[in-house]
Structure formats: C-alpha cells, structure tokens
Swiss-Prot record:
Protein function: One of the early assembly proteins it binds 23S rRNA. One of the proteins that surrounds the polypeptide exit tunnel on the outside of the ribosome. Forms the main docking site for trigger factor binding to the ribosome.
Cellular component aspect of the GO annotation: ribonucleoprotein complex; ribosome
Native source species: Bdellovibrio bacteriovorus (strain ATCC 15356 / DSM 50701 / NCIMB 9529 / HD100)
Quaternary assembly: Part of the 50S ribosomal subunit. Contacts protein L29, and trigger factor when it is bound to the ribosome.
PROSITE patterns associated with the record: RIBOSOMAL_L23
Protein name: Large ribosomal subunit protein uL23
Gene3D superfamilies: 3.30.70.330
NCBIfam families tied to this protein: PRK05738.2-4
Family membership: Belongs to the universal ribosomal protein uL23 family.
Keywords noted in UniProt: Ribonucleoprotein, Ribosomal protein, RNA-binding, rRNA-binding
Amino acid sequence: MKQVIKAPLITEKNTYHNAAGVYVFEVDLKSSKTEVKAAVEKNFKVKVDSVRTSVCRGHSKQTKFGLTKVAYWKKAYVKLAEGEKIALFEGV
C-alpha cells in the first residue's frame, strides 16, 4: 500500500488559499484525484468537495558536487466542504 499524502505544503502563498477552504499537499506522483480525496477524508476526518492536481517539473540544480537533478513531484489542491477545517494548518 502506497502512502498517498507525503507532506502538507505550508507556504505564504498557500496560507491565502486556507481562508477559502483550500489546502495544499505534496502527494505521490502516481496517485489519482480519487485516491487523494479518500486519503484526506480518512486521515483528517473531513468532507472533501474537490481535488485539483498539478505535476511540478524537475530541474537541474547546481551544488558544490556538480549538477544534480531534482525529481518531478505532484501537489494537490484540496477544497473542503463548507465549514470544514484541518487543524494542522490552523495557527500557521
């Protein structure tokens, strides 16, 4: 069984989405929208209204050891039903 949700993405830009009931997570690259919806509903015990996903391209990064690759990754914008909140994001 794969772990669908890897980490919450808490950035200044994403905190503006929280006011509208949209929360952003880094998810497994091969997970689908229905898998993300089920994982959020199960882990945080909330009702999910919709899920939008975005695949972020990998790129090359210069380090002191030379050029390395940053892998592709996927993020999911999860919109909750009216009145629902995730406590993990509150107070950030």
